[in-house]
Amino acid sequence: ATQQVLASLDWIAEEKEAKTFYLIGSDYIWPRASNKIARTHIEEHLGGSVVGEDYFPLGHTSFNSVINRIRLRKPDVVFASVVGGSNVAFYRQLKAAGLDMTSEDFNLLTISVTEDEVLGIGGENIEGALASMKYFQSLDNPNNEAFVKAFKARWGEDAVIGDVTQAAYLGPWLWKAAVEAAGSFDVDRVREHSPGIELDTAPEGYVRIHQNHHLWSRARIAEAQADGQFKVLYETEELMEPNPFPEGYQ
């Protein structure tokens, strides 16, 4: 929550002078928990208000009614955590409805769309949307350059890499380091020796395991481009402490 939800809301509230938010997500625990944290932060820390909140079943493909509500309520920001195939329908229908995410008049911030999802959505249908992630394929650093090159050599030039893919890549390397520190494959010993494990070869940059077994990482905001990639607009100068359920937000 600290790295993806709170950091992105702080940024957009300042950068876009946003005060009103419309929360939309798929109907399961992650979007609901994320939006509970988002609502608390918006109302109690940013001095803003939530003008709408809607959830849709997984696989839902008809968003015309909520798009009409968004038009009517004119929020400064649509905060989206729609997942899976529903993303294809949602963003294509936004585009068809004339809601232009490249304009200053309509801001959409997603915590659930990576380069992988854009393959299905189509870059032209999501251009201008803002995404909050720790990793984007376009990151300009030697670690990522080597990672992208190796990934495409294995999976083809058309393959893309999103935040979740990079996380899956990091997992075994972090586990390997923890096993070596523990000198054992025993689960409890590996858990005990995990906090403090560092990795300076991660495509996203240097990361470190926190006491809660999440990763210290930089938060990043990027803008979706028509070619399916993201242009990074902002990243925190320092690693952010990971906290999935910050005190006062439960």
Describe every region a protein language model picked out.
Residues 1-250:
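Extracytosolic ligand-binding ectodomains
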